[in-house]
A protein has these predicted regions:
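Short, small-residue-biased leader/transition segments that mark boundaries at the very start
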Residues: 1-8
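A charged, solvent-exposed segment within the mature domains of Sec-exported extracytoplasmic proteins
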Residues: 128-139, 147-148, 164, 182, ...
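Serine-esterase "nucleophile elbow" of acetyl-processing enzymes
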Residues: 22, 100-102, 110, 142-148, ...
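Glycan-recognition and processing domains
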Residues: 23-70
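Extended, charged alpha/beta regions that create polyanion-binding interfaces
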Residues: 66-178, 383-384
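Alpha-helical cap/lid subdomain in secreted, periplasmic
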Residues: 70, 226, 230-369, 426-440, ...
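Active-site-flanking structural segment that lines cofactor/substrate pockets
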Residues: 50-86, 93-95, 421-433
Length: 509
C-alpha cells in the first residue's frame, strides 16, 4: 500500500541517517584524561574549561576583564590524526559577530596541519552558523613518510565563550590529543588588538601568528577595551613564569595624560620585575588609520608613545635590566592595514606579528636565517618508531630532574646507541654503559633529524638550565641529498653559534 511504502521510505531515511552518523566518532578534548588546552596558563585550575583566568580572579579583577577572560582568545588544541577529513562542532554563549568583525573572526575556529618536515598547511572548513557551529575539513592529504597522518592545530574563537566542543573523525581513523607543552610561555597582555580584533579568523590574530612562527606557548591576555596595566591583572600575570612578557596596552590608555602613562608603564614593569627576571617588551601604540585626517588621533598616539618612551628611559636609568622597546615606526602599519580607525585587518595583524617576531628573536637569541638549514622546524618522520615531540618532552623533564654533565646531539646514529631517555631500540648498550654513562652523558639524538630540527630543539630548551662540560654534535647526514655543501656547512655554523650561546663554558666537539 501507499501508506506502507511511505513508512518504509521513512525508515530507510532514518537508517541511512543513523548509518551516516555512525561513520563518525566524536571526541571531547576535555575527556582524554590529561590537560590539552594549549597557551592557557593556570592549567591545574582551569585546564577543563576554555577560559583564560582562574576562577579566583572573579571579584579581584574588574567585571569587564573577568567577562572577557571567559573568551578563548589564543587557546588551541593540538592533536595527531590520519583522517582524510575532520569535523569540528561546538556551541558558544555570546553573539556570533560584531559590526566590524565577522562570525569567522568572533566565533570561528581554524585548523592547520604540520607535516613530517615541519611545513604548515591551512584548511578551509566552511562558514559557521546556527546554534551548533560546525566546520568540515576535507581533502586532507597523506604524509610522504608514513600513514600516521599529520599534527593538527585547532585555534579557538577569539571573542566568544565555548560551552562545549567536539572533534570528529571517520570511525576507522585515529585521533590522538597532544598534552600541554611543558615549555615556558610568552605572555601577552594587551587590548582588543591583542585579543584579536579585527582578524577575519582565529589563526590571523597577531599573537597566534607569532605563536606559530616561534613555536613557544603564548598566553593571550588581551582584553577588549580593558588592557589598562592594572595592578590586579598584573598580580595574576606575575603568577606565570614566562620566558618573555609583552605589554601592549597603550591603545586603552587614551584618556590618560603623558605623565600618568609614564607612571603606569613604570609601575607595571617594576611589578613584574619584583618576581621575575625574564625580559619585558614594551610595545608602542601602532597609531590610527585616520591620524592624518584627524589631528586629535595623531596627538593621542604621540602623547601615549612619548609617555611610554619616557618610562622606558627612566627604567633603564634606574638600572632595571632586560627591558626592551618596540616603536611605532618598527611596527610599520600602513593606513590601509586597519579595518576601522584602530583595529588591524589580517594584513595589519601580520605586519604587527612580523615586527614583534623580529624583536623577540633578537631578545631571546633565536635568529632565523634564509637557508632551510638555518630555519628551525619540528619533524615527525618516524612516528612508527618513536614520537618526536614526546622525546622532546622527556628530554626536558630528564634534564630538569637530573642535569647532565655531557650531552650528545644527533640523529638515529646516536638516538639508538643507548642511555636516557631510552629509545625504542638499543644497538650499543655495552659501550654506552662502559664509556658514556660514567661520563655523565644524556642522549639527545633523534632518529631522522636534520640540522634544522636540532636547531629547533636547541631553541626550545634542550641545552637550558644546566652547565655541561661537553656538548658533542653529530648531525648533517640526513641533509645530504637535500641540501648542497654550502647549506650544510652554514647550517652547522649557525647551529654551533646557538649551542655556544647557551653553553658558553662547554667544550664542543
Amino acid at each position: 500500500s501507499s501508506a506502507a511504502s511511505d513508512v518504509y521510505k521513512r525508515q530507510l531515511v532514518c537508517l541511512t541517517a543513523l548509518s551516516a552518523h555512525a561513520q563518525w566518532k566524536w571526541l571531547n578534548p576535555l575527556e582524554c584524561g590529561f590537560p590539552v588546552i594549549q597557551n592557557q596558563g593556570w592549567t591545574e585550575e582551569i585546564g577543563d574549561r576554555y577560559v583564560r583566568l582562574p576562577q579566583r580572579a572573579e571579584g579581584k579583577v574588574r567585571k569587564p576583564v573577568w567577562d572577557l577572560s571567559r573568551n578563548s582568545a589564543g587557546l588551541a588544541i593540538h592533536f595527531f590524526s590520519n583522517a582524510p577529513e575532520l569535523k569540528v562542532r561546538y556551541q558558544v554563549s555570546g553573539p556570533l559577530n560584531m559590526p566590524h568583525m565577522p562570525t569567522t573572526g568572533v566565533s570561528g575556529v581554524d585548523i592547520y596541519s604540520i607535516d613530517s618536515d615541519g611545513q604548515w598547511r591551512f584548511y578551509f572548513g566552511g562558514y559557521p552558523s546556527g546554534d551548533t557551529l560546525q566546520y568540515h575539513y576535507t581533502n586532507i592529504g597523506k604524509d610522504i613518510y608514513h600513514d600516521r597522518g599529520y599534527e593538527f592545530r585547532l585555534y579557538l574563537p577569539p571573542y566568544n565563550t565555548i560551552k562545549w566542543l567536539e572533534i570528529g573523525v571517520p570511525e576507522n581513523d585515529e585521533l590522538t590529543f597532544i598534552p600541554v607543552s611543558p615549555e615556558k610561555p610568552i605572555l601577552l597582555y594587551g587590548t582588543s588588538i591583542a585579543q584579536g580584533a579585527c582578524a577575519s579568523r582565529p589563526g590571523m590574530t597577531w599573537g597566534t601568528i607569532l605563536q606559530r612562527s616561534l613555536g613557544y606557548p603564548l598566553i593571550n591576555l588581551g582584553f577588549s577595551g580593558n588592557g589598562r596595566l592594572e595592578k590586579e591583572v598584573l598580580d595574576f600575570i606575575c603568577e606565570i613564569d614566562a620566558r618573555l612578557y609583552i605589554l601592549d596596552c597603550l591603545p586603552n590608555l587614551t584618556p590618560k595624560s603623558k605623565d600618568e602613562i609614564t607612571q603606569l608603564v613604570s609601575d607595571a614593569v617594576k611589578q613584574i620585575r619584583a618576581t621575575h627576571s625574564s625580559p619585558i617588551l614594551l610595545v608602542e601604540h601602532a597609531g590610527y588609520s585616520n591620524a592624518l585626517a584627524d589631528d586629535t588621533k595623531l596627538q593621542d598616539y604621540v602623547r601615549m608613545n612619548e609617555g611610554a618612551k619616557k618610562a622606558f628611559e627612566e627604567l633603564q636609568a634606574q638600572g632595571i635590566k632586560d627591558i626592551y622597546y618596540l616603536t611605532r615606526e618598527e611596527l610599520g602599519l600602513h593606513p590601509d592595514a586597519w579595518v576601522d580607525y584602530v583595529h588591524p585587518s589580517d594584513w595589519g595583524m601580520e605586519t604587527q606579528a612580523n615586527a614583534v617576531e623580529r624583536k623577540v628573536r633578537e631578545i631571546l637569541r633565536i635568529p632565523k636565517g634564509d637557508l632551510s638549514t638555518t630555519m628551525p622546524v619540528t619533524q615527525r618522520r618516524e612516528p612508527n618508531n618513536y614520537e618526536w615531540q614526546k622525546r622532546h618532552r622527556d628530554i626536558l623533564s630528564l634534564n630538569q630532574s637530573n642535569p647532565p654533565r655531557r650531552v650528545i646531539l644527533g640523529n638515529s646514529i646516536t638516538h639508538f646507541w643507548g642511555g636516557e631517555p631510552k629509545g625504542p631500540s638499543v644497538r650499543g648498550m655495552e659501550t654506552w654503559e662502559k664509556i658514556m654513562r660514567p661520563a655523565g652523558f644524556h642522549n639527545l639524538g633523534y632518529g631522522f633529524d636534520r640540522i634544522e630540527n636540532v636547531l629547533w630543539r636547541v631553541y626550545h630548551g634542550e641545552l637550558d638550565g644546566y652547565k655541561a662540560e661537553e656538548v658533542v654534535l653529530m648531525i648533517g647526514t640526513n641533509n645530504i641529498g637535500i641540501n648542497n655543501d654550502n647549506e650544510i656547512v652554514e647550517g652547522i655554523r649557525f647551529l654551533l653559534s646557538a649551542i655556544r650561546q647557551r653553553q658558553p663554558e662547554a667544550k664542543i666537539k
